[in-house]
Amino acid sequence: MVVQPKIDGCAIGLRYKYGQLVDAYSRENTEIIENIRAVNTIPLSIDDSLKAEVELEGVLFSPTFNSKSSKEQLLSDLNHETDSGPTLLFLAFQIFCSNSDELSDLTQLQNWGFDVPITLRTDDPRQVKRWHSQWIKNKLFSNLPTNGIVAKCNSSLTKNFLGVSPSSPNWAMALTR
């Protein structure tokens, strides 16, 4: 299994067609493609010679974002993203409909030019509990605005077997305070 920070930000979906960014949307299905192009950590094109269409998910956040800020404020900051405006960052963490394991997908995302979250790997569930305790003590992922950690299955076979529910994947679990 893998463990990543649960970034306190706004989930964003991106769609690339023949390597070009063609669509971006928030979890509320808000179309934000024009504004998202201003975020420097989102590639406008990727090398995708294997697939005609690729969809991925990540999180848009500000290094200074905290839980008291609203996600709507974060999205509205997209309208003001300039050289002197707020710095918004994007971490990609999932390729939809992928048959690869989690770590391979993260490597692919990096090859396409995305930043990905710090990812820890273990086969021991007790280690996940120890990492969660470290996170609570602000000793893990403390350089990021987090509101928990996420434990995920690494295996694509296990992920496909467990499937997804209407609100979240059954192969991932968020651990918070």
Predicted regions and their residues:
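RNA/tRNA-interacting regions in translation and RNA-turnover enzymes
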Residues: 1-177
